[in-house]
Structure formats: structure tokens, C-alpha cells
Amino acid sequence: MVLAPLLLGLLLLSALWNGGTAEKEEEIKPDQPFSGPLPGSLPADHRPFFAPHSSGDQLSPSQTGRSHPAHTATPQMTSAASNLLPPVAFKNTIGRIVLSEHKSVKFNCSINIPNVYQETAGISWWKDGKELLGAHHSITQFYPDEEGVSIIALFSITSVQRSDNGSYICKMKVNDREVVSDPIYVEVQGLPYFTKQPESVNVTRNTAFNLTCQAVGPPEPVNIFWVQNSSRVNENPERSPSVLTVAGLTETAVFSCEAHNDKGLTVSKGVQINIKVIPSPPTEVHILNSTAHSILVSWVPGFDGYSPLQNCSIQVKEADQLSNGSVMVFNTSASPHLYEVQQLQALANYSVTVSCRNEIGWSAVSPWILASTTEGAPAVAPLNITVFLNESSNNLEIRWTKPPIKRQDGELVGYRISHVWESAGTSKELSEEVSQNGSWAQVPVQMHNATCTVRIAVITKGGIGPFSEPVDVAIPEHSRVDYAPSSTPAPGNTESMLIILGCFCGFVLMGLILYLSLAIKRRVQETKFGGAFSEEDSQLVVNYRAKKSFCRRAIELTLQSLGVSEELQNKLEDVVVDRNLLILGKVLGEGEFGSVMEGNLKQEDGTSQKVAVKTMKLDNFSLREIEEFLSEAACMKDFNHPNVIRLLGVCIELSSQGIPKPMVILPFMKYGDLHTFLLYSRIESVPKSIPLQTLLKFMVDIAQGMEYLSSRNFLHRDLAARNCMLRDDMTVCVADFGLSKKIYSGDYYRQGRIAKMPVKWIAIESLADRVYTSKSDVWAFGVTMWEIATRGMTPYPGVQNHEMYDYLLHGHRLKQPEDCLDDLYEIMYSCWSADPLDRPTFSVLRLQLEKLSESLPDAQDKESIIYINTQLLESCEGLANRSSLAGLDMNIDPDSIIASCTAGAAVSVVMAEVHENNLHEERYILNGGNEEWEDVASTPFATVTAGKDGVLPEDRLTKNGISWSHHSTLPLGSPSPDELLFADDSSGDSEVLM
């Protein structure tokens, strides 16, 4: 009976409890159903709730506001009771996942938590022992039921990378106990990945070296193939890592490695293996500062040859031709690129060059430059000093010998004489100065019964040198009668007579020496020329006919000694000039094969003519070369046309070793070449406009000259604006026949050897097989017309020399200048026909140009016809030595200063076979003026008349002015050469040799 009420109470409490739990479950159901799959152990009608989270921020049921009923209704359990709870563990995972790179992957871990557990934490993801915080996306889902709650943690990676490889686990804390899931291994497979690639190295020629390549998977294994210059080195692969041993190389090569696995292959970067060579010569050698005994040399190191420069050597030698030629060598470190050369003589000229060394060897020396030391104080005192007392004049006579010129260290100004007089208790110090020509002096006696100490020093503009060793002289008591200032000394002074007699004897001796030297010189000449004169002829002092006969005989003997044929000797009678009639002056310019010198040629009437003399540099000439040289001179002597340069003569000079050296004598033209004239019209600070009528006149002049040469079967082969000269009346004449040849058989000439040629002026058929015809000169004339129309621009801007043949072969030609008439461009374009037979002759070209010139109106007035302010040749001496013009590229040939007819190879041309591309070369433009050219500018052209209706062509040079004054290269993405119409880009067209 007692238990019945108790059981009834328990049943009532149980009913109340179940009702409260159901009501709580009704509150925590989510509003939206779960769309994903349900755990297999849960009823299908359960509605879970889930919480997305990142960085391990897991939400427990209590945190989401949807706690399980057991968590709110179950009373607190004691520690002893918690130990009796059933164990909690994660369900088994998928274990291992293998997939390829860039794929997506999802995996999860799940756990059931009974209601009896009150304290639970969220699930966190761990990879390789480190908790994942914020780097990946995960979602935690909760599925509550009557017995507890099921928790599923989803983890996803959208595009897996190799870095996602690893072991993933879930962790959770339940009642302060950590629960860990089984690991999920994720393996990402893909192409091999390089952990070490080959590296570029610089090696010595034929020396072994190693290259290393290492790559990893997964999948493994990874096999390595080596590639050299796009060809496999090993037929059988090697397992990674692989080391390739190369026995040695003789030239540069590119190596790479291929890594293969089941997914494919990966190719490493290509590395270049460079062969160490000797360095290039230093460039830009300059003298930064000079003193009396030192010079400061600077230079820019050349290419190091893939090996660091170790040290440099500065070589210095005296520039004086009379010096012994000894070279002083100064070694210094490679950096800094400066060195002060000391222990030099003052006021002296030196030649300086620099060479540098790496581990392979020494570079070639840089071009020699000239350095001069300044004037300094003398290094020595006068020599042989003697002092004696002249009692008759009461003076001290002091004599000395001048120090050696090389020890004077400057221009001698005079001497300073210091004389100190000392007597008992008295001392007086005086000094005198003597002019530079003196070697003796008189000093009045200042004291008697005293001692005079004399010292002498040399004076130059650089200062006063050291005094000589002192010379003492005793002055005795004075016992003679003092004369008044107006008195004369007593007679009997024989020393003055001795001086006069000595001077007379000296003059007689000098005259005798001069006479003997002239006699010896005459005898040497007679011996040299084979005794051309009889004894009677040699007695004639003034007889022009006899001297002329002597010259002809000397020429005949010289030609006979050279072995020249008799027929050629007859042709050269009026061409070869006696060497004694030619006086050489300064050097105007130097080329690779010759130099141009200023000279004076004596005429028959006793006057002299200023000429230009072109000499050949070679030290030795074969008989065939001499005959070719003289034969061409004999042919060109007959040229008689106002638009063709005239040959004045040829001279054969015998060196001290008896080697004949030919020289060509040509008219001296101070106004220079046509290219320079046109260039200055465009690049001056205030550009000058040249009327179109004047430009056409230039073209007509050249066409007339070439028509004359063509009619005489002469090929020029180097026709360009730089080889056309301007006479004093501004008439253009064709010059520089250094490449010209006479053609006798047929109408062509084939060049038999590789020579330097002006590539951008050469016809397409000549570039192909080196065959030249008169139509090849027509092609060059078309390019010259384009030069004139563009006021001196370089043809084919942006196109390199080695690209010219392909450029022309594809039909490209020079574009029409912007201010060029259509009719004029049609004429020049006809000169560039691919078929030489389709090109017009020079006669047709001359007629077309004259007709076009006549159709144009006259220039507006004579004042509008100007001469360009070009510097005179005389004022340009030393121009090539200026450092600011070291990179000058204006296609100016030093030989084009004069009209050259030499048979030697022309300078200022480029080999067609050369394929070097100087991408960093810059082009500089000369600016400057000269008063003499300004005077010429006031004189109109002789052939152009002014008219009231004349129209001055529009000046369009603003586009071709300063914006084109520097060289530009063609980087990737630049316009094609066809679009670069007016770029003044030399691109290595010619080699300027000065």
C-alpha cells in the first residue's frame, strides 16, 4: 500500500518529463530542411542544423542556440558518474584520396554524441600536426535526435595544389577529453616539379664541368633526360636527381633537362654555358688631366670574355719620331678604371694605349691616343759655369752651357744669376736675369777685397729650376784709377778682337759645312737615279730645261726599276710627277688603306698649287698591284669633264728600305663633299632650306658626270653623296674612284675577292654574286638621288647591313620622301628595278631630270639660295680627336674630302659579308659654323636664276630635324622598316675612319 502512491508519483513525473522534452525539440528544429544526405543511422524525418565556419571556429549546439534537450534537462553529473559514460569516437574515414592537380575534393568526418554528455566543443581540422586556420572552407552539420546529436564536419578544396598534400584529421573535446579521428591522406599527383635546375656557368675551353637537375612527383619515379642545343644528350633516362658531366666545350652551348613521370614531362629553363675568352680591348681611353710629369688616364673596360678582369696595363711611349721607341709599361688593378702615369718628361708628347687581362690572357691594346704633358720647371741647372774677373772693365764675366733640351722641361725663357758679395762684416745678395739666347753675362764688381759666389738657374714658363753649384771668385784690392762715366777704357783690350775673330771663323766654318752637305746630297741623287747627268750638266746652276730632262730620266729609271712595261711607261710620261716637285703637309684624314695629306705641287712657271695627296698605307706592294695602280691612273688622266674630278698626277716615293709607295695627286676642294653639305642644311640650330631647283641641279650634275664615265666604259662602284664633291662654284663633280674599274670585255665586271663594299648603295644583283655593270651604278645613282631629296639622310633606316639582301629580295625599296615630287620619285624608283635591263641609262636619266628641272619655276630670289654653314677643312683639324665626337657616324669618308682616283680599296665602306649588329651604337650630329662659309652663303648658285614668280619649296625639315639626330634601334613591337621613312639611323652603314 505504501508503494502504490510512490509508483503513481513516479508515473506522473515521467509524463511531465516527456511532455517538456517534446516541447523543447519542437523549438530547436530548423526552418529550412537539410538538402544533403543524412547519416544512415538517423531517421529520414530528422531536420539537422549546420553552421559554416572557417579557421577552426567550430560551433557547439549550445553556441548555435539549438542545444539538445539533454543538455538543458539532464541534471549535473558527478565526476564518478562521468567515468561510467559510454566512450565517444569518430567514425571511420575514407582513409586515402589520390587525385590530380587543380581538381576539387571533398571529405568529412562524423561523430555521435549521446545526450548524457553535457560539455562538448566544435570540431577542428588539422593537417600534418598544424591546425588549419582560415585557409580552407569547412562546414559543420548537427543532426539531433532523442538519444543525442550526430555531428558531420565537411572539408572541401576547390583546386588542389601540391601544397595540399598531407594528412588531415578532426579533433573534438568532449567533457575535457580530446577525441581524434583517423587520418585522411590526400595525395596530389601532377607533372614533375623541379627542386633544382641547371645553372649557367662560364667555363674554360675544353675543361670538364657538371650540371645538376632534380625533380620530384608524385607520382614517382621521375626520370631525367639532358638536352644540349635542342638535341638529347643521353638516350637512356636517369633517375632524379641527375648530374651531367660534360667533358669540355669549344663553343657556347645551351643546356636544359626534361623531367618525366606518369603524368607527363616538364622542361627546365635553358642555361647558356659560355666559353671564357680573352677580353675585348678597352674603349673610350681619355686623358682626364695632365701635369708637367704625369697624366691621368681613364678607360672603359671592354667585354670581359666571361671571366672577371684581373688587372690592366697602360703602355706609354714617346710620340717623337726621333725617340728610341721604348715603351713604358704600368700595371694596375682592373678597378677603378683610372691610373696616373708618373715620371714623364715635361712638355712632351706621348702615345698611350690600355690593355686588360683575365684568367685566359691579355686583350688586344686599345687604339693609341696622344697625350701631352704641360710645361714645368726645369729639372737641371746650367752646366760648365766659369767666372773670371775682367780687370779692364771691372766686371765679372760669367759663362755657362745650356742644359739639354729634354731636361729643360719647357720653353726656355732665360736664366737667373744669383751673385752674393761677402767682405769683412759686409754681405750683399743680388740677382740678374739674362735672355734665353744668352750663354754669358757680365756683372759689375760690387766690392773689392771680397768674395763673390755665383749660382745660375734656368727659367721657363713653368717656373725656375734648381740653382747650380756655387762658384766662388776672389776680388782683390782695387789699385787702378777710377774713370769717370764718360771716360773710355784704356786701349789694348785684345779679348774683344778675339771674340770678333772667333765669330768670323764660325761663319766661315758654317758656310763650308753647308757647301759640303749640298755637294753630298747632289752626289747621292746622281747615284740614286743612275747618273742621269753628265759633268757638264751638273755645272748648270739655273737651267729649267736641264732640270726637266733630269726629272724625266729619273722617272724612267724609277719605272724601269719597278719592272713596269715599256707601253705603260709611255702612257705615264704625262702622269708621273717628280717627287721633288711635291711638298707634303699635314694629314687631312686617314682611312683603313690610305691617308689624305695636304700638299703643294710646284708648277713649271715657278708657282705652286695647293693639292690633296692620297697615299697608300701598305708597307709592301706586288708588281701586279703597282701596275694596276699606274694603269688606272693612266686611264683617268684623260678625264676631261666639268662633273668628273680631274687627276693631276701620280708620284712614286721610295722609302728608306727601297719599297715603292704610290701617291695620287688631286685638286684640293675646301668645300668638301655633298653629303656633309646636305646634312648641315638639316641639323643646324636654325635649319636652312635648299630650294628644290638646287637639289635637282645637283642630281643633273651627277648624272652628267656618270654619263661621261659610262660612255668611257668606266664603272664607279661607289657612287654616293659622300663621294660627290662641291667645286668653288658649287658644281657637283663625281669623285673617289677607289673602287672603279675599266671594263673591256662585255659590259660587266666580277669582283674577284671579298672587299669592303657600301652595302646600302649596292644593286641587288651585286649583293648576290658580286657582278657589277653600268646598271649597278644606275642603282647607286637612285640611292644618291634619295640622299639628296632627304637632305643627307641614311638610306634604309632601321635595316641592318646583313638584312639588306632579303629586304630587297622581298620587293622593298626606299620610300618616297615627304616633300619629294611624284615625278622625281618615279625617276629614282626606276633605278631600282630588279632586272638591270629595265633600268634607264644615265643619258635617259639626265634628260628626265633636265626636263623636270625646266618644268619647275625659278627660285624666288637669289637671297633664298643659300650655302650651308659647313666648317672649312682647315678649321676642322683635330676634329676626330675630340672625345665628344668619338661616336660620330655621318658616313663621312676622309678620302671624300678630296677627289680620289686611287686604285686602292676605298675606306668608309662595309663588307657585305659582315653580319654584326651594333645595337647600342649611337649617332651624333655635328653642329658648328664658320665665317668663311657664311661669306659663301651670300653668293647664289651660278646655275640658278631668281624669278619673281618663283615659289620656294615648303620647308618640311621640322620632321627631319632634331627628332632624327640620334640613332634608334628597332625593339620588339616597333614599326617595320618600311614605316621608318625618315629615321636618320646609320645602323652601321659605314665605317668612319679618321
From Swiss-Prot:
Q: What is its main location?
A: membrane
Looking at the UniProt entry, the stretches that span the membrane are 498-518
Q: Where is the composition biased (Polar residues)?
A: 55-66
**Residues carrying a glycan:** 108, 165, 202, 210, 229, 289, 311, 324, 331, 349, 384, 390, 437, 449
Q: Which residues are the active-site ones?
A: 718
User: For the Protein kinase domain, which residue ranges apply?
Assistant: 582-852
Extracellular side of membrane:
19-497
Q: Which residues get modified to Phosphoserine?
A: 538
Protein name as annotated: Tyrosine-protein kinase Mer
Q: Which gene encodes it?
A: Mertk
